[in-house]
């Protein structure tokens, strides 16, 4: 050996250090740490003096998920090289005293049946896209952010610059000693595993308040109390459902004289009720509630509480500040924000306001929280969501998308989009791809925020909105633009009424699908490749998506022709299933691609055969009407089948679901030869307000000829519903704890 003393010095200086084979999880190799979170997700850290980070961040919110020692193996290869294997990965690491990189680290995984090599060099070539922060001022397609899902089978999130969360508040991290913090999602072809991994490290998407997924009315207009109530009357008189009424800026005063302002006015921010338009806000909200509708208040908080506000003196006193010197809005100051919520929000909430529309557009003023690296939008979304939980309710976010981790604050508001066909087509594509990053629930401006009136476009946009997280209309302060669905012309009104009624009837399915998203992190609106990624055709049509497990949609986003305004859309029907047109009951076998033409009143929407689609009779309050009659729509399978769909129910508002307080009911479809059996199994679980009994209505479109029908062993005679054009079996009100079995003999 030529230079034993030099080698000895290297060891003394820490330039290289041999370590014993690590055990446990995380795996520590001197200043390197590798944490196995799931079989397909791991974390790479490098920190001088081993000062690793265990506090949560906005993205890495859940530090409790670790792969058990029984589910991975560490083998020493010699020469400070180690092999770590999980059920999905083989990791090879050479401990050389440097951060994890291209030469000392690699992971091997399977993609399309072949072994591939992963390194942590973040070159994203084949990413399948994700959300955008906002569609403000957007007129057509724009580049989307990355999502987790990639045809390369991996994605890396670098969390090194993120602030920590300590005792519920932001805390800067030591970026000098902690120099590497990467989360490596290496999932191959298993897209659902990648989404589940997001939930493992970042927390699962919470259950939303049920009414969030109902029907909304929103408009930038200065309505009076009487006009707000007349809007609710109009929905009832014109036979449209309604769940949520949004009070845009006109609820507060416009008399600010100081402040940063926005878009030509200093009055975007405000917290004092405008008593000239709304003399008794508490009474107004109480009356809206009495009619079964919730209230949301618009909020642009960037100018904080200023001298013209009626709560200014009390706010400044609580802050211990001189009223002669107004305070800037300060997201990074815990005392400021707690005092702000107390004085700006609590009075309106105590009047009955249900949640806030956080209309933050001020990243150009405050891109980051003062004193921290977190973006203002990230942190304000977190704080507002927490505040809406203060009365024991589920949080209710309603804000723009803030990036990784913001899925914990649903629902997202997509911004002030232009009303045109290109924008509609992009929203269809964007909504499906957004779930790739956990942005599961968009509340779009259905019909577009600004632009020339176009009733046909509004109808087609409504059809898309009926198959998204929220059917929420909105428009700017323009007398020509009002998205109330009965003012667009007789034919357009009838077409939209059909969609609004469908939305109401589908609520049991929608809410059950929301629970599925909470449980699995699989999106509500999801691209075809999430379920059918091995088929190349699943990647080809970005205008087609699954809505939950049973519905397939391809909304029309182009103007029609002729008297019927007929337009078409390309639809791929996945192999292995049979699909039925929701409106005409026409059958389409899987494995084919068709161009479907539809008049204005319909769009391409299909139901998977061989499953039970849970619905409810039409109700003007879709999200709050008790489910006393469960509608079971069943289309036949192509052959023998045995499939179970789970209906989910809870109180729709509280956080009791977190403690397992909810109910599920299995809905089983079984076909054996010429006998089809639909079984409603006994409800499992209970919750506050649960109905102990319900009736059932079995709808059998496309059933063909059958000899007889039995309900719990007794022969019954189905009725024929002329509007649905199908046989219907009625089952009287029954104890939900008792099984109901309906047999159809072909």
Short names for language-model regions:
Residues 4-14:
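Sec-dependent N-terminal signal peptides
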Residues 19-202, 208-211, 218, 225-227, ...:
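N-terminal accessory segment at the very beginning of proteins
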Residues 56-71, 580-600, 708-731:
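Solvent-exposed beta-strand/loop surfaces of large extracellular or lumenal domains
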Residues 91, 104-602, 608:
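Catalytic-domain carbohydrate-binding cleft regions of carbohydrate-active enzymes
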Residues 383, 417, 426, 711-746:
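Conserved, charge-rich beta-strand/loop surface module that forms ligand/interface-binding patches
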Residues 585, 593-635:
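Accessory carbohydrate-binding/adhesion or oligomerization-edge regions at the termini
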């Amino acid at each position: 050996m030529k230079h034993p003393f030099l080698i000895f010095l290297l060891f003394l200086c820490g330039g290289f250090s041999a370590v014993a084979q690590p055990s446990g999880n995380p795996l520590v190799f001197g200043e390197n740490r590798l944490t196995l979170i799931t079989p397909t997700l791991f974390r790479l850290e490098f920190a001088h003096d081993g000062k690793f980070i265990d506090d949560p961040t906005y993205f890495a919110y859940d530090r409790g998920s670790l792969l058990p020692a029984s589910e991975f193996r560490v083998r020493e290869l010699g020469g400070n090289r180690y092999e770590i294997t999980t059920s999905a990965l083989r990791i090879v690491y050479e401990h050389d005293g440097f951060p994890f990189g291209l030469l000392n680290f690699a992971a091997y995984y399977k993609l399309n049946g072949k072994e591939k090599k992963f390194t942590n060099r973040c070159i994203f070539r084949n990413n399948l896209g994700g959300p955008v922060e906002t569609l403000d001022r957007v007129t057509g397609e724009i580049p989307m952010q990355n999502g987790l899902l990639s045809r390369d089978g991996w994605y890396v999130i670098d969390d090194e610059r993120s602030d920590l969360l300590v005792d519920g508040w932001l805390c800067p991290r030591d970026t000098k000693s902690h120099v590497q913090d990467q989360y490596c999602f290496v999932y191959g072809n298993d897209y659902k595993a990648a989404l589940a991994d997001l939930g493992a490290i970042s927390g699962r998407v919470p259950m939303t308040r049920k009414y969030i997924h109902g029907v909304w009315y929103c408009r930038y207009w200065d309505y009076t109390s009487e006009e707000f109530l007349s809007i609710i009357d109009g929905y009832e008189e014109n036979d449209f459902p309604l769940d949520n009424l949004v009070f845009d800026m006109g609820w507060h005063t416009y008399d600010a004289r100081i402040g940063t302002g926005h878009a030509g006015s200093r009055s975007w921010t405000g917290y004092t009720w405008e008593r000239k338009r709304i003399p008794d806000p508490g009474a107004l909200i109480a009356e809206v509630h009495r009619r079964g509708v919730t209230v949301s208040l618009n909020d642009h908080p960037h100018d904080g509480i200023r001298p013209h506000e009626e709560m200014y003196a009390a706010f400044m006193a609580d802050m211990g500040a001189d009223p002669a010197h107004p305070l800037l809005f300060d997201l990074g100051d815990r005392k400021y924000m707690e005092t702000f919520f107390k004085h700006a929000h609590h009075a309106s909430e105590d009047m009955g306001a249900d949640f806030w529309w956080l209309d933050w557009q001020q990243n150009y003023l405050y891109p980051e929280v003062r004193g921290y690296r977190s973006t203002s939008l990230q942190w304000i979304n977190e704080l507002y969501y927490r505040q809406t939980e203060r009365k024991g309710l589920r949080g209710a976010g309603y804000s723009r998308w803030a990036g990784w981790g913001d899925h914990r604050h649903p629902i997202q508001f997509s911004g002030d989009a232009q009303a045109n066909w290109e924008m509609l087509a992009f929203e269809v594509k964007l909504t499906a791809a957004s779930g790739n990053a956990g942005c599961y629930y968009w509340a779009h401006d259905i019909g577009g925020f600004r632009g020339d009136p176009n009733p046909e476009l509004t109808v087609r946009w409504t059809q898309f909105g009926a198959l998204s997280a929220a059917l929420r209309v909105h428009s700017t302060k323009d007398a020509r633009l009002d998205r109330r669905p009965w003012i667009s012309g007789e034919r357009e009104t009838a077409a939209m009424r059909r969609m609004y009624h469908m939305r109401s009837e589908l609520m049991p399915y929608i809410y059950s699908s929301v629970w599925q998203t909470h449980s699995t992190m699989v999106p509500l609106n999801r691209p075809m490749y999430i379920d059918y990624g091995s088929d190349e055709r699943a990647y080809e049509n970005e205008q087609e998506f699954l809505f939950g497990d049973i519905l397939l949609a391809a909304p029309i986003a182009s103007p029609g022709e002729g008297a019927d305004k007929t337009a078409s859309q390309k639809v791929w029907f996945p192999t292995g299933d049979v699909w039925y047109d929701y409106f005409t009951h026409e059958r389409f076998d899987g494995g084919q691609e068709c161009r479907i033409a539809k008049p204005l009143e319909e769009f391409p929407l299909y139901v998977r055969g061989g499953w039970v689609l849970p619905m409810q009779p039409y109700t003007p309050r879709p999200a709050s009407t008790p489910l006393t009659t469960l509608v079971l729509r069943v289309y036949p399978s192509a052959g023998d089948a045995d499939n179970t769909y789970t209906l989910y129910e809870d109180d729709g508002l509280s956080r009791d679901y977190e403690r397992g307080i909810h109910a599920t009911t299995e809905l089983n479809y079984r076909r054996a030869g010429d006998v089809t059996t639909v079984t409603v199994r006994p409800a499992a679980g209970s919750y506050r307000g649960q109905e102990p009994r319900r009736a059932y209505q079995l709808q059998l479109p496309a059933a063909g000829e059958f000899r007889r029908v039995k309900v719990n062993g007794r022969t019954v005679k189905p009725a024929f519903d002329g509007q649905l054009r199908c046989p219907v079996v009625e089952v009287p009100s029954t104890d939900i704890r008792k099984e109901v079995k309906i047999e159809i003999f072909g």
